[in-house]
Amino acid sequence: MEKPFELAYTELKKGCFPEELSFRTTAEIKPLEGVIGQERAVKAFDFGLAVKMKGYNIYMAGPSGTGKTPYERNSTEKLAQTEPVPYDWCYVYNFQNPRSPLALRFEPGQGKQFKEDMAELVQLFKTELQKAFRAEDYETQKNTLEHSFDEKRDALMAEMSAVAEQYSFQVKTTNAGVFFMPVVEGKAVGEDEYDDLSEDVKNKIEKNSQMVQEKAGSIMRELRDMDKESKRQTDQLDYKTGMFAIGHHVNAVQEKYQEYERVISYINAVQEDVLENISQFVEEEEDGEDSLASLLPMLGKKPAEDVTLKYKVNLIVDHSDSKGAPIVVTFNPTYNNLVGEVEYDSEFGNLTTDFMKIKGGLFHKANGGYLLVQAQDILSTPQAWEALRRVMKTREINMDSIREQLGAVVAPTLKPEPIPANIKVIMIGSSYYYELLNEYDEEFDKFFKIRADFDYEMPRTDENIRKIAQFIKRFVDREGCMEFDVSAVCAIVEYSSRTAERQDKLSTRFNHLAEILCEAVTWAKLEGAELVTAAHIQKTIYEKEQRMKLYEEKLDEMLEENVIMIDTEGAEIGQINGLAVLDMGNYAFGNPSRITATTYVGKSGIVNIEKEARLSGQTHDKGVQIITGFLGQTYAQNFPLSLSCRVCFEQNYNGIDGDSASSTELYCILSSLAELPIRQDLAVTGSVNQKGEIQAIGGVTHKIEGFFDLCRKRGLTGTQGVIIPVSNVKDLVLKDEVVQAVKDGLFHIYPISKIDEGIELLMGLSPGKKNKAGNFPANSVHGRVMKKLKAFDKRAQGEEE
């Protein structure tokens, strides 16, 4: 057997050394501007900001901590400062349809000015109208008008009385109108006396009554017409007087806002309503302090402020102090927070509202600018996505109540006029949320036409290493903390590479790096150091791991006490050491696991015990099926594959998924069939395809370190090691203690590309090559396996016969 190829210690990690950098401390370099390693995302995002057409909202996808939010804020703020300030918006009373307040648009700052101008105008209405209607000239005109009609009324009443008297009737005037009372023997007769009269007298009265009603009818019509004319002329006088008093003030306001056609129309409507309701401005209070009305306001007149309520202005968007386009960030996108709401007052159990209780939402604040939201917040808040998609689709802000959206019965409410929306929505979230929204809403692509994908890693180039140093400098300047020396920067670069799990990559999850920087500064302070060094970085990483490795230590204890059985010496048939990664959320570690296989005569094929126990995931099940394909392709070309096999991850109670153990399981099955023992001082990881090629897997660094830690605690023998796919060599970023053990020849890492390479390493026997007849050498591993499978097939056929 030839000596197997193994990796040199120099291939197990890629170091970063101070001589590679051109500074001694971060004090000598400039802080970072922008983001690192996100060229594709930056290009997409900047293009999305530049497109102003409908549907070009932006979804920023990628894992947290890659710089999405800071870049979004910085880029958006820079652009927003160069863009125009959007319109102010006001809601005002709708005199034609009070249930639908009108939305008025103004240039920035003019909304606030209009509100003040209208308040001042209404105050002028009060003072000028009271002055005009208390003036002597008005009183003279009104008295003259009233006197003229009084004379005419008296003349008509006298004529009516004469007609009534002619037929023995008397005219009586009450609040209810004009009545005719019969006169008998010079005395007016009431209802009681009328019943006592004789029938002849009654008949005469009835006859005369008809005559009176007939002749007095025309006079009554004249009286009614005269009263109407009196009111018309009085109203005309009031209108003329009121117009003279306030018209020039109204004209002044209209002239100020002459460019706004809808505002002019609204002011005209205000003027007409005021002139039609002049009495509410000029009548004096009649209720005293002790009146019932003062004790129970709901039974008396409305408070004075209610008189002018409908002339007020509800300014819901004010940009008087704004510079550039607005940027609104929300982490609580409830329906009401987004679209706004109409508030209510409760008065004696009744809900009341008016247009002044309309409250603008985040859409109103962001209109003409940018709304920044988190996908998770939108998806976890009821009706938030529906509100957002409706604004993006209709380009209107419609303030429907959430109860209406849910179909609930609500109290009568207002229907404010929708406001045109011009909002660029920028949503931040993971790729998972993007796919979820895309699946959930078939129009999602129409709303978010730009996707900016932020990568979790970047190439390990000199330029990116320099930018990481600048990132550290930016952290130092922002936090006002001590500087980092060049060794600390090198340690951070190595940590970044380890986080990316690639020798040729660096992590872009800078929130993780920032945590290390923050804690390293603290350790340096506790030691009284002047600079943060590599030792502080290493201590930070060590202490961080110690805080989170309780579960790992519990497993280690069970391994040491042989509660969990793993052999690291000797050899066993049908038994092998597999490797898995346990992910605890913010901490992951490698964990060795014993895998066993048993084979016997039968036709049930390979049975995955994990699957039978419902502890296996779909990807692991697929890996088991691939093993069946390999066995059939390799051995069963000339006879049927008659085999029963059970494969098990021993002492696994938490479930397993992934195909990274498929090669390991295959070795175990081959060992059982060939009756050849497998070395227990080696652990194996790697996926296999149906052609026997070893494929890359994830978490190779953690897996190696997990088996190494177990071997080190039990004592390194010099023969122990791990078999990995050759395609994973670039992923190795091992700890220094593993690198040193390999350097000292105490631990070994074997990269392989074919299943046959692992067979020879594990079983110490040549796998054998198939000849033209389709057979393997008898004393090879494959030959022994084929012999056993043929024997199984014969027995199976014999049992059938």
Q: Can you say where each PLM-predicted feature lies in the sequence?
A:
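Peripheral, non-AAA+ core regions of ATP-driven protein-machinery
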Residues: 354-363, 369, 375-382, 386-388, ...
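Conserved ASCE/P-loop NTPase catalytic core
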Residues: 1-438, 443-461, 465-486, 490-526, ...
